[in-house]
Amino acid sequence: MAESWVIMVTAQTPINIAVIKYWGKRDETLILPINDSIRVSLDPDHLCTTTTVSVRPSFEQDRMWLNGKEISLLGGRFQSCLREIRSRARDLEDEKKGIVIKKMDWEKLHFHIASYNNFPTAAGLASSAAGLACFVFALAKLLTLQEDNGQLSAIARRGSGSACRSLYGGFVKWIMGKEENGSDSIAVQLADEKHWDDLVIVIAVVSARQKETSSTTGMQDSCKTSMLIQHRAKEVVPKRILQMEDAIEKRDFPSFARLACADSNQFHAVCLDTSPPIFYINDTSHKIISCVEKWNRSVGTPQVAYTFDAGPNAVLIARDRKIAALLLRRLLFHFPPHSNTDSNSYVIGDKSILQDVGVQDTKDIESLPPPPEIKDNIPAQKSNGDVSYFICTRPGRGPVLLPDSRALLNPETGLPK
C-alpha cells in the first residue's frame, strides 16, 4: 500500500432526548440497562454531531479531536467500539485512488477522528451519545460493514448507552434485552420524524457547564444506594413504556406529556434518593417546571411536556407550533436576557418562531405581558440571565453521510483543518 493516500468518511448524527429515562446498568462492561427507554431524536440542522474518520498507512496511532482539541483515546469507550468494528471490517477497494485494503489490514491501520458538536458538550444535552453514535456510524461506513443500524446500535451501546438511540431518527426505543452477552439489547425505531411532525421542541439551556456528577458515576451510585430505582425499573417503567408507545402511535399528546413529565420527575427523585444525593436540576429548572405546570393546569389539559436529562437544561415539547409560540412568550417573560444580550443569540435554531411570538429585539421581550395564569401572582422580580439561551427545534432524521466538502480533516494530511 502506498504511504501517501488518505481515505475519509464524514457523517452527521442527531442528539436524542429521553422521554422515558435510562438510568442504571445491570452490566457495566457491556453497558446493559436495567430498563427499556424511549427517546426522541432532534433535528440535526439545529443539534448534531459531525464526525470525520480518516485512515492512512503512515498514521502511527489512533488520534481524536473534539471541537478542535485533541482528547485521549485510551479510555475504554472508544477502544471497545474500535475493536468491535475492526473485527467486522471487510475488504475495501477504491478504484479511483487505486487502493485496496484487505480485511486483515484494518488491524494494522490507525485512524484520525475529528468530531464537532454544535451544542454544549457534557451539559446534559446527550453530547456523548451523539458523539459515540456518529463515531460508530462513520467508522462502520469507512470499514464497509454490512450491519444495519440496529446491529450498529449494539456496538454504539458499548461506548455510550444512549448512543444506540442516535442511530435512528424520530422516536426510538432502546430494548434492555435479556441475553447475558447483550446481543438483544439494541435500538429500534418506533416511528420516524414525519409521524408526528406537529411537535415543536424548545430547549432552555440553563447551564453549559460540565456537570459535577457524571452520568456514569451517578448511575453506579443510584444502583448501589437507591431503593426507588429498583421499584422504578421493575414496576413503573415497563408499564410506562407500553403507554408511551401507544401515545406515540396515536399521537395522543395529553398522554405523551403526562408520561414524559412524570418519568422525568421520577428520574430526578431517584437521583435525590441516591446517597450521596445527586442534584442535576437547579432552581432555574424548578422555575421552568412551575411555569409549565401552572399553564397546563390553567388550561385543563397538557399544552407542553417537560423533561430533564442529567443536567439542568429543560427540554420542552409543545403539541404544535401555535402552542410553541405561546410557550416561548412565557419563557421570555419569565427568563428575559440581560439588557446587553443580542436577541438573535438568545433564541437560536428555528428562529422563525420569534415572528409568531412578535419579538424582534430585547425591547419587545421587555414589553411582553404576563401570562394570564399568573395575572394575580405576578413575580416581583424576573429571572434575568438565568437562562443562557433557547434552542427551537423539532423531531429529526437519523444519521447521514456528508460530502467530502464538509470534512473536518484535511484530505491531504488527515489532520484537522
UniProtKB/Swiss-Prot annotation:
Keywords: ATP-binding, Isoprene biosynthesis, Lipid biosynthesis, Lipid metabolism, Lyase, Nucleotide-binding, Peroxisome, Steroid biosynthesis, Steroid metabolism, Sterol biosynthesis, Sterol metabolism
Motif position, Peroxisomal targeting signal PTS2: 39-47
Primary location group: other
Intrachain S-S bonds: none
Gene Ontology CC terms: cytosol; peroxisome
Pfam families in alphabetical order: MDD_C, MVD-like_N
Binding site residues for (R)-5-diphosphomevalonate: 22-25, 77, 160-165, 216
MF annotations from Gene Ontology: ATP binding; diphosphomevalonate decarboxylase activity
EC number assigned by the record: 4.1.1.33
Enzyme class: lyase
ATP-binding listed as a keyword: yes
Catalytic activity as recorded in UniProt: (R)-5-diphosphomevalonate + ATP = isopentenyl diphosphate + ADP + phosphate + CO2
Cellular localisation: Peroxisome
Pathway: Isoprenoid biosynthesis; isopentenyl diphosphate biosynthesis via mevalonate pathway; isopentenyl diphosphate from (R)-mevalonate: step 3/3
Single biological process term from Gene Ontology: sterol biosynthetic process
Superkingdom field: Eukaryota
Matching InterPro entries: GHMP_kinase_C_sf, Mev_decarb, Mev_diP_decarb, MVD-like_N, Mvd1_C, Ribosomal_Su5_D2-typ_SF, Ribsml_uS5_D2-typ_fold_subgr
Residue ranges crossing the lipid bilayer per the database entry: none
Function: Performs the first committed step in the biosynthesis of isoprene-containing compounds such as sterols and terpenoids. Component of the triterpene saponins (e.g. ginsenosides or panaxosides) and phytosterols biosynthetic pathways. Catalyzes the conversion of mevalonate diphosphate to isopentenyl diphosphate (IPP).
Quaternary state and interactors: Homodimer.
Family to which the UniProt record says this protein belongs: Belongs to the diphosphomevalonate decarboxylase family.
Protein name, entry field: Diphosphomevalonate decarboxylase 1
Lineage: Eukaryota, Viridiplantae, Streptophyta, Embryophyta, Tracheophyta
